[in-house]
Amino acid sequence: RLPRIARDHLAKAHAAVIAGVEAYNKPGSRFRTDQYIVLMMMAWTALFHAIFFKNGRRPWYRKKTTKRVRYVYVDDEPKHWELATCLEEYYQDKNPPERTNLQFLVALRHKIEHRHLPDLDPVLYGECQAALLNFEDLLGREFGARYALTETLAVSLQFSKSIPPQKAAAMRLH
């Protein structure tokens, strides 16, 4: 049985990934890729936190000044690792494609939050699709089919018969 804190983080990960997919698939939505990336980064962070808690590890920043283990607190709560730190701790010296995908999206998220960017939708479809498929793969590997998203997500309907080259390429990847 999973610790409650791991289940709570999994619930947050599920909610964020579903909200991200909804935002991306909403017809006529502006900034769909921007919203998707921000929500997927939240989902991935919560997923990694759930993995660490499942494995008995606290994904919290430690104070460096004491001999005993002490944690950094913000607003009376331990400061959790952000996604970049989770990637370092989880993958360590390995650099699989999913890590590269997430590092790219983390850097892009910072730009989305702090600068104006041109329309990203056509160019980033493949990266967005990879982030979703990689999320589902890691979720299944770490927690099993019981926690899979495949039952809650559906393939979105399309209004057009034509498929932009980026979408066609992404569909061939998986």
Show the residue positions of the predicted features:
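Conserved catalytic-core segments centered on acid/base and nucleophilic motifs
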Residues: 23, 27-48, 105, 111-120, ...
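Short, hydrophobic, well-ordered secondary-structure elements
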Residues: 13-14, 21, 33-54, 129-132, ...
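Charged/polar positions within long, soluble alpha-helices
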Residues: 22-25, 48-56, 110-118, 137-151
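A broadly used, surface-exposed interaction patch
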Residues: 52-125
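Charged alpha-helical initiation segments
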Residues: 1-37, 156-160
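Amphipathic, Lys/Arg-enriched alpha-helical patches that create a basic surface
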Residues: 124-171
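Amphipathic, non-membrane alpha-helical segments in soluble helical-bundle scaffolds
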Residues: 3-13, 33-40, 95-105, 121, ...
